[in-house]
Amino acid sequence: MNLFATILIIMTTLSLVLALVSFWLPQMNSDTEKLSPYECGFDPLGSARLPFSLRFFLVAVLFPLFDLEIALLLPLPWGDQLNNPMETLFWAMTVLILLTLGLAYEWAQGGLEWAE
């Protein structure tokens, strides 16, 4: 038998054995408290249409912006190997200034204030 057929037979046998063992083993400690879902302190059996705070959404929108900032600035140390490293520095500073101005605007508008 070739290697592929041997590996296929071993994988099939092992899969069947593991599936049969999982059906034969009893459920240990099946308690209603352990079988209920855990939802981080929220009632899992309540309504799914609870109002969502807009503050969470605003913070969630700000996070990817600054995450992308880090991703854009990571290759910056390799920019000095280019023909014109000052152009790379110019565009990196432009991105930083735009994001800083956006953060200052959001802060001035009160978007980062949690309690009103």
Swiss-Prot record:
It comes from the Eukaryota. It is found in: Mitochondrion inner membrane. GO terms for cellular component: mitochondrial inner membrane; respiratory chain complex I. Its EC number is 7.1.1.2. Keywords: Electron transport, Membrane, Mitochondrion, Mitochondrion inner membrane, NAD, Respiratory chain, Translocase, Transmembrane, Transmembrane helix, Transport, Ubiquinone. It is an enzyme of class 7 (translocase). It is a multi-pass membrane protein. Core subunit of respiratory chain NADH dehydrogenase (Complex I) which is composed of 45 different subunits. This is NADH-ubiquinone oxidoreductase chain 3.
